[in-house]
Amino acid sequence: MKNNKKGFTLVELLAVIVILAIIALIATPIILNVIDDAKTNAAKNSAYGYIDALEKANAQDMLSSESINVLSGAYTIDESGKLMHDSAEVAVKFKGTKPTSGTLTYADGKLSSGSSITVDGKKFTSDADGKLTLSK
């Protein structure tokens, strides 16, 4: 009589499980880093969007009024996302995650070095060119 046993042995199945576990151990930190980088980039894009919205609001204000008010001084963002300048709230139309804190300092209409903005718990600081970098 012919013996036709088909299937995998217990040792073969255990070997496959061990290999899959090793692959999972290697892949998990990589995937988590990709997710964290995506969250950081999303927060950075929201920060840039908020800054652009402020600058656009100022440009619209200059077009609709007869005076030219170049962005200057410190603009402070409170916990609720309100932007304050000289004790007055500045209206900023913005879609995205609002910042929770920060101080945007402008000189002659240009974002100054050392300005900061926090979005989703990630604090970004500007350099002399207005580029935002994540503060550790």
Regions found by a protein language model. Give the residues of each.
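Short coil/turn residues that cap or connect secondary-structure elements
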Residues: 5, 39-42, 58
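N-terminal single-pass transmembrane signal-anchor helix
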Residues: 5-31
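N-terminal hydrophobic targeting signals that begin at the initiator methionine
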Residues: 1-2
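Periplasmic/extracellular, small/polar-rich flexible segments of pilin-like filament-forming proteins
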Residues: 56-136
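Aliphatic-rich helix starts adjacent to a transmembrane/signal segment
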Residues: 33-51
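Enrichment for repetitive, rod-forming helical segments
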Residues: 12, 46, 51, 62-63
